[in-house]
Swiss-Prot record:
Keyword terms: ATP-binding, Cytoplasm, Kinase, Nucleotide-binding, Nucleus, Phosphoprotein, Serine/threonine-protein kinase, Transferase, Virulence
Positions occupied by motif TXY: 171-173
Name of protein: Mitogen-activated protein kinase mpkC
Active site residues of this protein: D141 (proton acceptor)
Record field: catalytic activity: L-seryl-[protein] + ATP = O-phospho-L-seryl-[protein] + ADP + H(+); L-threonyl-[protein] + ATP = O-phospho-L-threonyl-[protein] + ADP + H(+)
Domain remark from Swiss-Prot or TrEMBL: The TXY motif contains the threonine and tyrosine residues whose phosphorylation activates the MAP kinases.
Keyword field contains Mitochondrion: no
Modification sites for Phosphotyrosine: Y173
GO biological process, one term: stress-activated MAPK cascade
Compartments where located: Cytoplasm; Nucleus
Organism field: Aspergillus fumigatus (strain ATCC MYA-4609 / CBS 101355 / FGSC A1100 / Af293)
Family statement: Belongs to the protein kinase superfamily. Ser/Thr protein kinase family. MAP kinase subfamily. HOG1 sub-subfamily.
PANTHER family, per the entry: MITOGEN-ACTIVATED PROTEIN KINASE (PTHR24055)
C-alpha cells in the first residue's frame, strides 16, 4: 500500500504519495488545486492536480469519472498526458501529468507574441483538435489558459472536465465567454465540434492582435461584439434557435454588415493568417472550417504533414454519459478506473515531432526559449 505525505498548500490539505517531493502551488480553480512536484521514479517534474471532494455529489463524481476516462483514452502529443493517478486517505483524487512551464494566457498577458510563434501554436492547437474531434469528443472549454507550453515550443491542450460527446441535445453554458461560439449563446440545443474551431479562431485572433477579439462584459454584450465585426446571423442560423426570446432579440438588432477581418489585426499580418481566421470565425457552424481542413491551409504549410497528424483509433465510448447514477455508484466506477490504470502497463508518452519530417523546430525552439527568458517565464 502506498505511503502518503500530508502538506498544507494555500490553506488546503495536499496528500500525495512518497513517489513525489517538493509540491509547489501553480494554480487554483473551482474544482481543485494544481502543484508542481518532482517524480522520484521517472526523475521528471510533474503537475499534480488535486480534485477536491469528488464524491460529494453525483454531478461532481460523474464529471470526475468523465475526465479520468478521457485522460486514459486520449493520447496525443498535443494533449496533456496522464502519468499517474491515486486516491488519498481523505478520498481526494490526484492526477499527475507532465509539467509544462507556462500557458498561453500568461504569455499573452506579458508581451506580444512574434508571428512565427502564433503560427506554430495555432498549428499545434488544430492538430490536437483534429485528434480530439476524430474521437467524437468536443473539448468545449478551449481558451488560452488551457493551452500549456514549454520552452521547446511544445503545446498541449489540457482540462477535459467539460468535454462532451457530439450529440443531438447539448446544454448551453460552457466555455469562457470571450471564446464561446455564438451557437452556444443562441441557445441551440444541438452543436458540434465546430464550437472548438470557433474558440481556436478567437485564440488565433488574440495572438495576432495582442488582445481578445470579443471581450464581452456579459452575454448580450458578447453577442453585440460578434455582430459588430462579423455581421448579423444569416437566416439559416436564426432558424436553428429554439428560444423565442432569443429569436426576437436577434431580429431586433440593427442591420450590420460584416467587416473585413484585416481591419481588426495589425496591418503587417500575414494575408494567409487572415484568410484562415475568416474560415474559423464563420457565424454558421455548418459552413465553418473543420480542424482537419484548417491544417491544410497555406498559413500552416510550413508545418503541415498529413502523415504526422494522427486521428484517434476510434470513437470514445460515451455510453456512460447518459446515466444518472447515485454518487456511490460513480464512486465505485472511479475506483475501478483508477485500479485499472494502475494495474496495466500504460503506453509511453506520445513521441515528440519526428526530426526527420520536413519541418525542423530547433531554430524556433531556440528563439522561443529566448522569448521566455526575456519574459521572465523561465
Amino acid at each position: 500500500m502506498a505511503e502518503f505525505v500530508r502538506a498544507e498548500v494555500l490553506g488546503t490539505k495536499f496528500e500525495y504519495t512518497t513517489r513525489y517531493v517538493n509540491p509547489q502551488p501553480i494554480g487554483m480553480g473551482s474544482f481543485g488545486l494544481v502543484c508542481s512536484a518532482f517524480d522520484q521514479i521517472t526523475q521528471q517534474p510533474v503537475a499534480l492536480k488535486k480534485i477536491m471532494k469528488p464524491f460529494d455529489s453525483s454531478s461532481l463524481a460523474k464529471r470526475t469519472y468523465r475526465e479520468i476516462r478521457l485522460l486514459k483514452y486520449l493520447r496525443h502529443e498535443n494533449l496533456i498526458c496522464m502519468r499517474d493517478i491515486f486516491i488519498s486517505p481523505l478520498e481526494d483524487i490526484y492526477i499527475a501529468t507532465e509539467l509544462l512551464g507556462t500557458d498561453l494566457g500568461r504569455l499573452l498577458s506579458i508581451k506580444p507574441l512574434d508571428s512565427k510563434f502564433s503560427q506554430y501554436f495555432i498549428y499545434q492547437i488544430l492538430r490536437g483538435l483534429k485528434y480530439i474531434h476524430s474521437a467524437n469528443v468536443i473539448h468545449r472549454d478551449l481558451k488560452p489558459t488551457n493551452i500549456l507550453i514549454n520552452e521547446n515550443c511544445d503545446l498541449k491542450i489540457c482540462d477535459f472536465g467539460l468535454a462532451r460527446l457530439q450529440e443531438p441535445q447539448m446544454t448551453g453554458y460552457v466555455a469562457t465567454r470571450y471564446y464561446r461560439a455564438q451557437e452556444i449563446m443562441l441557445t441551440w440545443q444541438r452543436y458540434g465540434v465546430q464550437v472548438d474551431v470557433w474558440s481556436a479562431g478567437c485564440i488565433l485572433a488574440e495572438m495576432l492582435r495582442r488582445k481578445p477579439l470579443f471581450p464581452g462584459k456579459d452575454h448580450v454584450h458578447q453577442f453585440h461584439l460578434i455582430t459588430n465585426i462579423l455581421g448579423n446571423p444569416p437566416d439559416a442560423v436564426i432558424e436553428k434557435i429554439t428560444s423565442k426570446n432569443t429569436v426576437n432579440f436577434v431580429k431586433s438588432l440593427p442591420s450590420r454588415e460584416p467587416r473585413d477581418l484585416s481591419t481588426v489585426v495589425p496591418k503587417d499580418t500575414d494575408f494567409d493568417a487572415i484568410d484562415l481566421l475568416k474560415k474559423m470565425l464563420v457565424i454558421d457552424p455548418d459552413t465553418r472550417i473543420s480542424a482537419q481542413d484548417a491544417l491544410r491551409y497555406p498559413y500552416l504549410a510550413p508545418y503541415h504533414d498529413p502523415t504526422d497528424e494522427p486521428v484517434a483509433s476510434g470513437p470514445f465510448d460515451w455510453s456512460f454519459d447518459s446515466a444518472d447514477f447515485p454518487k456511490e455508484t460513480w464512486k465505485i466506477m472511479i475506483y475501478s478506473e483508477v485500479l485499472d490504470y494502475l494495474n496495466v502497463d500504460n503506453p509511453a508518452d506520445p513521441a515528440p515531432f519526428d526530426p526527420s519530417t520536413p519541418f525542423d523546430p530547433s531554430a524556433l525552439e531556440r528563439e522561443f526559449s529566448e522569448f521566455l527568458s526575456d519574459s521572465g517565464q523561465i
